[in-house]
């Protein structure tokens, strides 16, 4: 419940900021390449949120507190998230300068989406996760977390 809710609000923030930025940039026509860039940036955000949430669950299963698990889970996913976003930003920057017309607009939309995706994954979703977890009385039940029980070998 808790992490899914944080993801939904993070993704809604991503969508609203993305739409606002695209509408404020003059002269960008939304074509098939632009739509694919929007979908790809949204999929990146979902994928990296999932990766961070998986790390949080793994950290919690080792016995850490929920707040500590969130902090170390995001810390573990930071390098992969930043690497992927930086590489894709540089690729879209190269495409932006090496192309014209429809590909030029798609590269601009993808660059914008990569930056917004990184900000929402690393900042907004994490912020909403902390907000809901600070208000939940039964934090562990709120996120449906379970600790792994150590099985004893006989």
For each predicted feature, which ranges?
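Hydrophobic alpha-helical transmembrane segments of membrane transport and translocation systems
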Residues: 58-154
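Residue-level signature of catalytic and energy-coupling elements of molecular machines
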Residues: 21, 48-50, 81, 117
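Short alpha-helical transmembrane interface motifs in multi-pass membrane proteins
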Residues: 2-6, 36-39, 75, 109
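A cytosolic-side transmembrane-helix exit/cap motif
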Residues: 23-36, 52-61, 123-133
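Interfacial segments of transmembrane alpha-helices in multi-pass membrane proteins
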Residues: 1-31, 97-102
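Hydrophobic transmembrane alpha-helices
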Residues: 11-12, 32-50, 112-115
């Amino acid at each position: 419940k808790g992490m899914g809710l944080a993801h939904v609000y993070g993704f809604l923030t991503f969508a609203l900021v993305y739409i606002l930025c695209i509408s404020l940039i003059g002269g960008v026509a939304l074509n098939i390449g632009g739509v694919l860039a929007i979908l790809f940036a949204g999929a990146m955000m979902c994928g990296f949120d999932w990766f961070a949430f998986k790390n949080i669950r793994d950290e919690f299963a080792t016995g850490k507190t929920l707040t500590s698990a969130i902090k170390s889970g995001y810390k573990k996913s930071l390098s992969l998230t930043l690497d992927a976003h930086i590489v894709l930003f540089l690729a879209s920057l190269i495409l932006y300068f090496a192309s014209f017309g429809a590909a030029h607009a798609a590269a601009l939309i993808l660059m914008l989406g990569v930056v917004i995706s990184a900000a929402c994954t690393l900042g907004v979703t994490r912020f909403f996760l902390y907000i809901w977890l600070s208000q939940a009385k039964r934090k562990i039940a709120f996120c449906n977390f379970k600790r792994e029980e150590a099985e004893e070998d006989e």
